[in-house]
Amino acid sequence: MIKLTKRQSDVLETIREFISETGFPPTRAEIARRLGFKSPNAAEEHLKALCKKGAIEMLSGASRGIRLVDRASNDDPTDNLGLPVIGKVAAGYPILAQENIASHVNIPANMFSPQADYFLSVSGTSMKDIGIMEGDLLAVHKTTTVRNGQIVVARIGDEVTVKRFEQKGSIVRLIPENEEFNDIIVDLESEEFAIEGLSVGVIRQGL
């Protein structure tokens, strides 16, 4: 078990709460505002301490480059299967179909708010600027109700993607968090589209 100071625990809980509320990690300035620090530099020092203790990982060059570290162990065969990890989604199958489940991870669903129903294995770098990297596990709450600005898992035809959601009338714009990628524009009147879930957190495995 990681031993944290009271202030380090506060910072870690703030990160978890922010991810639960928005689907992506906070910046140093946002942590400082929430906890009443005088400057983002104070938040940075606590983040470095959390990183050194293995509670988080920090990505250089990204303002939201904070990731919670999955330290759960699956070594005990008596453990429950845990939440399913969705790998490549097979065309024509519901996202939680057995054909799509690559594995399970023993992480409590109620670690996230709203609670996670499954994890999606992230492929690609279109969301890297908010700390969602290839190979990460994206915690997803299964819902079809989302708001503009939230990070969603969406299905366009037979393809599943993770993007920031914006809708105006019958036009949906799926926005990447990487300037190398273009927005995806969907016309609901002529294209097949569905919301598969809401991002409620992101975890990197194996550290």
Swiss-Prot record:
Keyword line: Autocatalytic cleavage, DNA damage, DNA repair, DNA replication, DNA-binding, Hydrolase, Repressor, SOS response, Transcription, Transcription regulation
Active-site residues (renumbered): 126, 163
GO biological process: DNA repair; DNA replication; negative regulation of DNA-templated transcription; proteolysis; SOS response
Domain of life: Bacteria
Pfam families noted in UniProt: LexA_DNA_bind, Peptidase_S24
Keyword Metal-binding on entry: no
NCBIfam families found in the cross-reference section: lexA
Name of the protein this chain belongs to: LexA repressor
High-level lineage: Bacteria, Pseudomonadati, Pseudomonadota, Gammaproteobacteria, Oceanospirillales
